[in-house]
Curated annotation (Swiss-Prot):
<dbReference type="InterPro" id="IPR020573">
    <property type="entry name" value="UDP_GlcNAc_AcTrfase_non-rep"/>
</dbReference>
<feature type="active site" description="Proton acceptor">
    <location>
        <position position="240"/>
    </location>
</feature>
<protein>
    <recommendedName>
        <fullName>UDP-3-O-acylglucosamine N-acyltransferase</fullName>
        <ecNumber>2.3.1.191</ecNumber>
    </recommendedName>
</protein>
<keyword id="KW-0012">Acyltransferase</keyword>
<comment type="pathway">
    <text>Bacterial outer membrane biogenesis; LPS lipid A biosynthesis.</text>
</comment>
<keyword id="KW-0443">Lipid metabolism</keyword>
<dbReference type="InterPro" id="IPR001451">
    <property type="entry name" value="Hexapep"/>
</dbReference>
<dbReference type="Pfam" id="PF14602">
    <property type="entry name" value="Hexapep_2"/>
</dbReference>
<dbReference type="Pfam" id="PF00132">
    <property type="entry name" value="Hexapep"/>
</dbReference>
<dbReference type="InterPro" id="IPR018357">
    <property type="entry name" value="Hexapep_transf_CS"/>
</dbReference>
<comment type="similarity">
    <text>Belongs to the transferase hexapeptide repeat family. LpxD subfamily.</text>
</comment>
<comment type="function">
    <text>Catalyzes the N-acylation of UDP-3-O-acylglucosamine using 3-hydroxyacyl-ACP as the acyl donor. Is involved in the biosynthesis of lipid A, a phosphorylated glycolipid that anchors the lipopolysaccharide to the outer membrane of the cell.</text>
</comment>
<dbReference type="GO" id="GO:0016020">
    <property type="term" value="C:membrane"/>
</dbReference>
<dbReference type="GO" id="GO:0009245">
    <property type="term" value="P:lipid A biosynthetic process"/>
</dbReference>
<dbReference type="InterPro" id="IPR007691">
    <property type="entry name" value="LpxD"/>
</dbReference>
<dbReference type="InterPro" id="IPR011004">
    <property type="entry name" value="Trimer_LpxA-like_sf"/>
</dbReference>
<keyword id="KW-0677">Repeat</keyword>
């Protein structure tokens, strides 16, 4: 991968207006506070405007209305944060994979390997696995029988796909995530729990990113489905038969119980718990550590839980909360007595 770009090249890549030397070389990205010569910074939040006078960055990504506050090389764009996201791909060494198959890899019968695939050391492919063009599998990854991995999809080290899992194009799966393990399905009986065998699979759309050590269980009968453009953080649990709509974002430590359906363009913050068999409509934002116990049919922001306070204050409030029912009954009695007078 190329490691340096002229400002002219970056301006063309970002469709940006260039102010400064078109031949000036950018070799890395950095924050306003830490940047030095030949590094590109950006400002997306006005709170950082105070650093424009002192930054040592070689050039900055700026909105046009910030241009007058900075005298150095500039790439002017409507949305600097989006531009930074796009240009970050040019300087990320982790996206480099060399085509080829490591001699320690095990390739099952009937596999179809697309053009330019990269298969690292100790990868195991079951029978009838299909890899799209440019797909890359990191060391120690295990792919079960009959899985499909789309073009340019990248799996980091020690990813596991159970039998029949399907991944779309341009996905990223980080280290240690597991897709297609059995959902938590058991029928109670007098003699103990009877396992319900999970006969569905997991189907993931295009441009999905799944964080490290996240688990997505296979469906009991229907497939668990993750639609296009979904982003999922580390350490998320998604149970069997769940459906996640397009472009929804799910932060770390969230757990979603079985058969819940979540709409498109939702944001679910960290450590949210969502019980099973619910429907959450499009455009819902759920704040951190919320417990969702019923379906949500209107877009908007939803919260639950008690925010942090000093321990002494929290203990007083907790004691009062335990007395809330009694206080409510006393208030009702007072209102009735006043009405009777």
């Amino acid at each position: 991968m190329k490691r340096s770009y002229s400002l002219a090249e970056l301006a063309r890549y970002l469709d940006a207006e260039l102010k400064g030397d078109p031949d000036y070389e950018i070799r890395a990205l950095a924050t306003l506070q830490s940047a030095s010569a030949h590094q590109l910074g950006f400002i997306a939040n006005p709170v950082y405007q105070k650093y424009l006078a002192t930054t040592q960055a070689g050039a900055l990504l700026l909105r046009p209305d910030f241009s007058e506050y900075y005298s150095g090389h500039q790439l002017l764009v409507a949305n600097p944060y989006q531009a930074y996201a796009h240009v970050s791909a040019l300087f990320d060494p982790s996206v480099e994979f060399s085509p080829g198959i490591h001699p320690t890899a095990v390739i099952g019968d009937g596999c179809h390997l697309g053009h330019g695939v990269s298969i690292a050391a100790h990868v195991v492919l079951g029978a009838n696995v299909s890899l799209g063009d440019g797909a890359a599998l990191g060391p120690g990854t295990v792919i079960g029988d009959d899985c499909h991995i789309g073009a340019r999809t990248r799996l980091a080290a020690n990813v596991t796909l159970y039998q029949g899992v399907s991944l779309g194009d341009d996905c990223i799966l980080h280290a240690g995530c597991v897709l297609g393990a059995d959902g938590f399905g058991f029928a109670p009986s007098a003699g103990g729990w009877i396992k319900i065998h999970q006969l569905g699979s997991v189907v993931v759309g295009n441009r999905v990113e799944i964080g490290a050590s996240t688990c997505i269980d296979r469906g009991a009968l229907d497939d668990t489905r993750i639609e296009d453009g979904v982003i999922i953080d580390n350490l998320v649990q998604i149970a069997h038969n769940v459906r996640i709509g397009k472009n929804t974002a799910i932060a770390g430590h969230t757990a979603i119980a079985g058969s819940t359906q979540i709409g498109a363009n939702c944001t679910i913050a960290g450590a949210v718990g969502i019980v099973g068999h619910l429907h959450i409509t499009d455009g819902v934002h759920i704040t951190a550590m919320t417990l969702v116990t019923h379906s949500i049919d209107k877009p908007g922001s939803y919260s639950s839980g008690t925010p942090m306070s000093q321990t002494r204050e929290w203990r007083k409030n907790a004691a009062r909360f335990r007395q809330l029912d009694g206080l409510a009954n006393r208030l009702i009695k007072i209102e009735r007595d006043q009405s009777a007078e």
